[in-house]
Structure formats: C-alpha cells, structure tokens
Amino acid sequence: MTYKDIKHNEEVNELLKKGNQNLGLLGYTDHSQAHCVRVAETAAHILKKFGYPEHDIELARIAGYMHDIGNAINRSRHAEYGGLLANEILKQYDLSIPDRITIVAAISNHDESTGGAVDPISAALIIGDKTDVRRSRVREKPKASFDIHDRVNYAVTDQTLKINTEKKIISLNLQIDTDICSMYEYFEIFLQRMLMCRGAADMLGATFKLTANGAKVL
C-alpha cells in the first residue's frame, strides 16, 4: 500500500472530516485533512533529511495522514482510539504485520498527554504534528471570542522548521505577535508539546531547539 492509497480511503477521510467537525463544536483549532497532509509531509521530510530508507518514510506519511482519525470518536484519548481504528483499516491492505503495528504505534503515541516517541517513525510524526502552529489553523469567528488556544495560534505570524543534518539539530523558529499573545501564554499552552518534540528529536539522534522572535527558548 502507499500514502496515495490511504489519502483516497473513504473511511479515513470521513473519520477525519467528522473528527474536525467534532473539534470545531468543542472550540478546538483546525484538525482537517490539510493539517494531516502537512504532518505527513513534514514527518517524511524529517526522515528523508536524516537518511532513513524510503520504506520508513512512506510509513511516516501514512501514519501522519491518519494520526487524528480518533477525534471522530472522542478528543480524550483520541490517539489510542485512532490506533485502534487504523489497525482495522490497514488490514484491508497488503501491508506486513510489523509495518501495520509500526503505523498503529506511531498514531497511538502522538499525543503529549499519553504518549511519546517509540521509534523514528513516531518521532517524526510527533515533530510534524506539534510544530504545526500557524494562524490559518484558527477557525473563522470573531476575535473577541478567541480562547487562549486561538490567540496562541493566531499570534504566530511566521513559522519555519529547519533541519541541520550536519549538526543534527531540528529547530522550530517562530515569529509571535506579542500584542495578541504573550510569551507566557504561548508556553503555558505549548511547553509540554515542545518538550515532547525534544524527546522525539532525541529518538532521531538529534537535538530540538525552539526560537521565538529571535530568542532561543529551548
């Protein structure tokens, strides 16, 4: 099976659509297919830069695209629900059992409240997911109704993820409009996620660094 196959899987796409609708009603930022594609492509890019085989890169793409399907059931423990759903969906394909388990484990371990990197594929997925901080993820609504999650994402005016393979450094560089969100608010929401990225980078034999408005903060 391929990444293209899973992107065209009706059940996967309906789960993503329903999950994003659920999260919208609960007040969460965008978790649409656009987010999942971005996570898949970032995870693949990370592994490619560090010289992993194409087979592993493809598994990371698949896991990245599917990682949020559990939101269709419930936001709480969505990573584990997603893993269970993915396990059944992937049985439809000519995928080896070890590869299926690898994808399921990556999905099941991507949430900072319950998981952590267990192999390079899960590590790349985590970094791809947690570094997707951008203004366009905020749903359209009056700014007066923004909660702290909305403000933090809306305040990010520029985001770049850089990979230095020679020095083995993965760096997230953010520009934050502090008139919208203070640095304290940013770290109140994202510190645990950034620490998860640090653990994921370590799994890849690299160091994770975070820079905000030109200042090194992690």
Could you tell me what each predicted segment is?
Residues 24-25, 49-163:
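Divalent metal-dependent catalytic cores for phosphoryl transfer on phosphate-bearing substrates
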Residues 43, 124, 197:
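Aromatic/hydrophobic pocket-lining residues that form π-stacking "cages" and hydrophobic walls in ligand
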Residues 1-78:
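Acidic/His-rich, divalent-metal-binding segments that scaffold phosphate/diphosphate chemistry
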Residues 132-218:
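Terminal helices and disordered tails flanking the catalytic cores of nucleotide-processing hydrolases
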Residues 28-31, 116, 189:
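Non-transmembrane, amphipathic alpha-helical segments
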